[in-house]
Amino acid sequence: MDDNYRIFNKNLITNAARRGTPQVCTGNGGFEPQPFDKEYVLQKNKIEECITKTLQSIGDGRISASAYDTAWIALIKDVINRDLPLFPWSLEWIVSNQLRDGSWGDRDFFVPCDRLLSTLACVVALSTWNVHPNETERGILFVKENISKLEDGDDVHTTLGFEILFPALLERARNLGIEGLPYDDPTTQKICAERDLKLDRISKELIINEVPASLLLILEGLENLNWENILKLQSPDGSFLGSPATTAFVFMETKDESCLSYLKKTVQNFGGGAPSLYPVDILTRLLAVDRLQRLGISRFFHSQIEDCLSYIYRFWTGNGVFSGRDSEFCDVNDTSMAFRLLRLHGYNVSPNVFTNFKKGDEFSVYGDDEVVDSPSTMLNLYRASEVRFAGETILEEAKEFSHNFLQQRQGLPNQVLDNCLISKNLHTEIKYELETPWFASLPRLEARFFIERYNAVDEVCIGKSLYRLPDTNEGTYLELAKLDYNRCQEQHQMEWNHMQQWYEDCNLEEFGISKNDILEAHFLAAASIFEAERSGERVAWVKTQILSHILSTYYFIKQSHQDHKPQLSTEKAHIAGQPGKGFKNVQRIISILFEALTQMKKDALEGSNGDISDDLLHEAWGGWLKKLGEGETEERQEAELIARTINVCGGHILSKQILSHHEYKTLSQLTNQICHNLHNSKMIGKEMENEMQLLVQLVLQESSNGISKAIKQTFLVVAKAFYYRAYFSAKQIENHVSIILFEQLV
């Protein structure tokens, strides 16, 4: 092979051989996949059942309760007896959930803004009804002793609207005559000054006539509002952007019955408490699908994922989506995640939704003047922009903006800290995405990275208070991902042993092939088509890649033109070897090819992939050899040959009719062109990007009377493997091979 591809040193080959599991080879050069052991099956089924139940019961989405929002609901007075709370059980929830240090807020993660705002809100609620004085005093003491922590260090994890909401609550506390709070503390004065500056920037026109989403979430911190106009922005469920605190405030001011219905339902569902956002049905489904896909275990939950995506698509609008259904407003974070996942699964979604968030040269959170300043949000926008089709200018602009933003944050110390998410691995995740474009990100490469850095269990979202999403924060996702990864890796190692045996038995070294070449081909196949049950397709990929290379490099085959139907046989082909290569060697490589094709068919049949005609594989090779013999080397057909072999062995192509389909021909030609250029030039420029975008469009877009998704996906899989090989250096590929194929996950 090309010297540039002789990348693996002898130590890697030696170590690979040592680490491989015992091989299971048949006597005729075939490969027998390792059966699943009972312990693995039982463990896998148990975890899978648990995750399935969770996915099927998402409903409105589970979310942790918020002391801040609960306190606002506890402030509501009974409509008949104004001296009593309308939601007394919310007061009981507050008392039951005070932390040991006297504060309220997230129990496991201390963020000063969250603790101080939540504690102050609970103090105001308890003082309003003059109940539980001991708990109230402990809360007051906590605020007084910890207000200075807002000045400690660079706390980027500032909760949403803190500089507006905290002073507003302090004013309520002052009006109630609550003593002991740090009203005149220098830190408090600084926060109030920030509040005044922000309010000065908000024009009276916006507040009175057109409230942007960024302000709608913090209405409880504002004054002199036009309630008639604000009520026009109410969601169908009665809430305001799914915020219980804001909705409680609106009800106190307007007595709107829809607000009350929403609050009653929420408090009932949360046992007296209330979350920071509700519902979170869209966000929960987005995170579930995204994590299952990136962890490499989505195939176990195909129907559940389709249900989730179908649900999300029901609420997809020309403006995008929000974390909860039927929202009057949409945000760029949820819209980016939804766009990417829906497009990848064949849904018709327009990139024009992102024009709603474009403000000049920047992108905003809600489509208003609040520019995105969150690395996690910008990462989702960047990932969405990577699945663009040719000519989608708005996604090019989104990619340029998000890429520059993320690069700048990566280069500054502590600037990857996020104001929407607390995640210890966000920095490394951004680094991976910037260094590994989607076209070069093979499934096993992404899964390995994501599994090793998966910390969803510890992730905390930042709104007006901190919150968690239990449906997607469970450790079962990671448990299944590790179990499946190691099982697939065992299978890949057994296949590697088989490929080494095949290499020795066929004496491929005589044809200029090294074990390094076999290992590289095996890695590309295993990293692209990783599922343990698809062993036959991987082995077919490797043998096709190796044998086509031998034939195209060392021999020129002139097909007899006497037959209209090309036949793959030593008798019908005129074979002329290179100097020093005898006719017997040519006969032997053709014999090896015949044996390989026979075994491919057998493996496919044993894999229950349906009946496979000998003609499908033989004619694929016959056509390829004929074109090679006619001198058609300018546009090599290797990629299409690999793709067709995979599709035949995978049971996706069962008749020759599909090969003459216009869509199939277009995909074949484009894939061959892309892979030929990547193989020869190793340069990835604008033209290559455009060709890949066109291929992605052909693969992902639904078409009437088109070929199956599985067939189309195979072309993209092969093209991405060629892209990967051209994009990464020899040293990087060597490292990937070692990690992905031979280092077990623990």
Curated annotation (Swiss-Prot):
Gene3D superfamilies, alphabetized: 1.50.10.160, Farnesyl Diphosphate Synthase (1.10.600.10), Terpene synthase, N-terminal domain (1.50.10.130)
GO molecular function ontology, one term from the record: terpene synthase activity
Motif (DXDD motif): 331-334
Tissue expression from the record: Mostly expressed in stems, and, at low levels, in roots and leaves, but barely in flowers.
GO biological process: gibberellin biosynthetic process; terpene metabolic process
A cellular component term, taken from the record's GO annotations: chloroplast
InterPro entries assigned: Isoprenoid_synthase_dom_sf (IPR008949), Terpene_synth_N (IPR001906), Terpene_synth_N_sf (IPR036965), Terpene_synthase-like (IPR050148), Terpenoid_cyclase/PrenylTrfase (IPR008930)
Highest taxon, organism lineage: Eukaryota
PANTHER family assigned to the protein according to its UniProt record, in alphabetical order: COPAL-8-OL DIPHOSPHATE HYDRATASE, CHLOROPLASTIC (PTHR31739:SF30), ENT-COPALYL DIPHOSPHATE SYNTHASE, CHLOROPLASTIC (PTHR31739)
Family statement: Belongs to the terpene synthase family. Tpsc subfamily.
Domain text: The Asp-Xaa-Asp-Asp (DXDD) motif is important for the catalytic activity, presumably through binding to Mg(2+).
Record's protein name: Probably inactive copalyl diphosphate synthase 3
Annotated source species: Isodon rubescens
Encoding gene per record: CPS3
